[in-house]
């Protein structure tokens, strides 16, 4: 199945593009999509695997986790969480 990973700031700058299509097996999860994404763009591994802060993940406009299942054609949004005061 194919899914689109939409990369927010700063991830898209590392990948050089805002959207990346990845091909996954049926029954794949967000973690599987991240693995495929890191194979296509190895420099993203350091940003996505950051122990200090994890990116916020949304699938079809709903908050998701790495173990969340995916369906054909879904869009995964990966954004950096921010806070302010």
Where are these regions (language model features)?
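Ubiquitin-like/PB1-type beta-grasp interaction modules and other compact soluble beta-rich domains
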Residues: 1-84
């Amino acid at each position: 199945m194919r899914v689109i990973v939409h990369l927010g700031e700063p991830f898209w700058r590392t990948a050089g593009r805002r959207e990346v299509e990845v091909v996954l097996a049926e029954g794949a999860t967000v973690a599987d999509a991240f693995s495929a994404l890191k194979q296509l763009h190895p420099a993203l591994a350091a940003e996505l695997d950051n122990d200090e802060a994890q990116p916020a993940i949304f699938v079809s406009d709903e908050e998701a986790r790495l173990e969340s299942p995916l369906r054909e054609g879904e869009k995964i949004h990966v954004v950096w969480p921010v806070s302010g005061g």
